[in-house]
Amino acid sequence: MNFFIKLIVFLFIQGVLQLTIQEAQAKKLTFVRDAETESGIRALITPLLQSAGLDNDSVNIYIVNDPTLNAFVAGGPNIFLHTGLLATSGSASQLIGVLAHEIGHISGGHLSKLAAAQKRASNEALIGTILGGAASFLLGNPSAGSAIMSGGQHVGTRNLLRFSRTQELSADRAAIRYLDASKQSAQGMLNFM
């Protein structure tokens, strides 16, 4: 019985930690507003959005004041570009390649698919935990239970990583299609990524 109490506490703490991590990440973002930069990025992204069949006004661009080399899509059709990415881009074609990749995530519906993949991975880990707890209790062998729990977590993590790699490859392929359709070179994307 003691094991099940620990399990419930563990799952509760995991949920609280996840919320805390998400809140902390959201609060850390500070944005840069610069009309000239935003206008330039919008000019670069417009042909790509047209190639992807997306409405230019439906995609928002945010510049995040962060020196790291990063870009991501979050919260719907929102592209976040770190200032570090903008500073590090050696050419417009490199930035265009990154933008095309992020548009690939949006047009592929990867955010909604990610939520489903995370839920599956969480369920796989939870099933492993429940089976491990049951095995530990029924067999009287905590080591066997721990091994099953670890296996369930490993399966969930591995499947989520596989999903992530698939989505990244899909976004890259879409980016190349959008670059070709808008008559832009993919060389910057290939050099930068």
Predicted feature residues:
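N-terminal secretory signal peptides that target proteins for export/translocation
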Residues: 1-4
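Bacterial N-terminal signal peptides
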Residues: 6-18
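Peri-catalytic and regulatory segments of divalent metal-dependent proteins
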Residues: 24-139, 156-163, 169-193
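N-terminal accessory/precursor segments of enzymes
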Residues: 136-149
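Short, conserved phosphate-binding/catalytic loop or strand-edge motifs used
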Residues: 146-155, 193
